[in-house]
Curated annotation (Swiss-Prot):
<feature type="binding site">
    <location>
        <position position="81"/>
    </location>
    <ligand>
        <name>S-adenosyl-L-methionine</name>
    </ligand>
</feature>
<comment type="similarity">
    <text>Belongs to the class I-like SAM-binding methyltransferase superfamily. rRNA adenine N(6)-methyltransferase family. RsmA subfamily.</text>
</comment>
<dbReference type="InterPro" id="IPR023165">
    <property type="entry name" value="rRNA_Ade_diMease-like_C"/>
</dbReference>
<dbReference type="Pfam" id="PF00398">
    <property type="entry name" value="RrnaAD"/>
</dbReference>
<keyword id="KW-0489">Methyltransferase</keyword>
<dbReference type="InterPro" id="IPR011530">
    <property type="entry name" value="rRNA_adenine_dimethylase"/>
</dbReference>
<comment type="function">
    <text>Specifically dimethylates two adjacent adenosines (A1518 and A1519) in the loop of a conserved hairpin near the 3'-end of 16S rRNA in the 30S particle. May play a critical role in biogenesis of 30S subunits.</text>
</comment>
<feature type="binding site">
    <location>
        <position position="33"/>
    </location>
    <ligand>
        <name>S-adenosyl-L-methionine</name>
    </ligand>
</feature>
<dbReference type="GO" id="GO:0005829">
    <property type="term" value="C:cytosol"/>
</dbReference>
<keyword id="KW-0694">RNA-binding</keyword>
<keyword id="KW-0963">Cytoplasm</keyword>
<dbReference type="GO" id="GO:0003723">
    <property type="term" value="F:RNA binding"/>
</dbReference>
<dbReference type="InterPro" id="IPR001737">
    <property type="entry name" value="KsgA/Erm"/>
</dbReference>
<feature type="binding site">
    <location>
        <position position="111"/>
    </location>
    <ligand>
        <name>S-adenosyl-L-methionine</name>
    </ligand>
</feature>
<feature type="binding site">
    <location>
        <position position="35"/>
    </location>
    <ligand>
        <name>S-adenosyl-L-methionine</name>
    </ligand>
</feature>
<feature type="binding site">
    <location>
        <position position="60"/>
    </location>
    <ligand>
        <name>S-adenosyl-L-methionine</name>
    </ligand>
</feature>
<protein>
    <recommendedName>
        <fullName>Ribosomal RNA small subunit methyltransferase A</fullName>
        <ecNumber>2.1.1.182</ecNumber>
    </recommendedName>
</protein>
Length: 293
């Protein structure tokens, strides 16, 4: 029996009942899959390593499975939901399953790709979410860009996306998402999630990805990103090309690209997949600027 001061998590019966009440069918368009296993939810929250001082932002709370567990471990939870029916039902669910914790919940009815600092009552320190699978990487990067206060991330994504995000330089799956995510700090796999904990059950496995934001040798601001991101994009646009060839468009010519690469102490004959984020930042020439400002 749950303590009255805590939250009663949602199981398969409650998830189906809520969906029927709201006439909600999880849609592929919105990347919706609802977690209906309390043990999985507890595991996600434990992996996030939240403290009682953390202010969590959750993207895509759905019917509230993860949200209910998060409020037990954090100072507050802001749920960003694009579906008005789901957003309207969340407070009702909290009155039913966690009335003593309902004051910790805030809801933002908005597309997560458009959410801004001004939408938040409290700036988040952690992002914990079962991300909509069709936009998981863009949402992850947007949240890290928009909220410099986020210092820890634990997200559930498709297993192959999790592998790509946490890939090391030189591997076949290392690419643009890997480099851009590591711009903020180390990216690691934090576990696997089976198909049967979801409704409806997806066709593929899921994975947990953890990012711990670190104080880097470069500024994690818009000005820096605008210099680094285009170089990363250009380097991976045609993976089989050498950096000299791949970056010739960015720098204006192959010769100019080679000069920039050599100035950054990078072999022009390498391919983009061989460089880590530090190399790309150095190539963008923004390391020195941080010290000057």
């Amino acid at each position: 029996m749950e303590e009255p001061s805590g939250a009663q998590l949602l199981g398969p019966v409650e998830i189906r009942a809520l969906a029927e009440k709201l006439d909600v069918t999880p849609t592929k368009k919105l990347g919706q899959n609802f977690v209906h296993d309390p043990n999985t939810v507890r595991r996600i929250v434990a992996a996030a390593e939240l403290t009682p001082d953390d202010h969590v932002v959750e993207v895509g709370p759905g019917l509230g499975s993860l949200t209910l567990a998060l409020v037990e471990s954090a100072a507050s939870v802001t749920a960003v939901e694009i579906d008005p029916r789901l957003a309207a039902e969340l407070p009702e669910t909290f009155q039913w399953r966690a009335p003593a914790l309902a004051h910790k919940l805030s809801i933002v009815l908005k597309d997560a790709l458009k959410v801004q600092q001004s939408d938040m009552e409290v700036q988040p320190t952690a992002l914990v979410a079962n991300l909509p699978y069709n936009v998981s990487v863009p949402v992850l990067l947007h949240m890290l860009e928009e909220f410099p206060t986020i210092n820890k991330v634990l997200v559930m994504v498709q297993a192959e996306v999790a592998d790509r995000l946490a890939a090391d330089p030189g591997s076949k799956i290392y690419g643009v998402p890997s480099v851009k995510a590591s711009f903020y700090g180390p990216v690691t796999r934090a576990g696997s999630i089976g198909k049967n904990v979801f409704w409806p059950a997806p066709k593929i496995e899921s994975g947990l990805v953890k990012i711990v934001r670190e104080d880097t040798a470069w500024k994690q601001d818009d000005e820096t990103r605008k210099k680094v991101w285009p170089i990363i994009d250009a380097a991976f646009l045609q993976r089989r090309k050498t950096l000299r060839a791949a970056l010739s468009g960015h720098y204006g010519s192959g010769q100019a690209a080679e000069e920039a690469l050599r100035a950054a102490d990078i072999d022009p004959t390498l391919r983009g997949e061989k460089l880590d984020v530090t190399d790309y930042v150095r190539l963008a020439g923004v390391l020195q600027q941080k010290d000057e400002k």
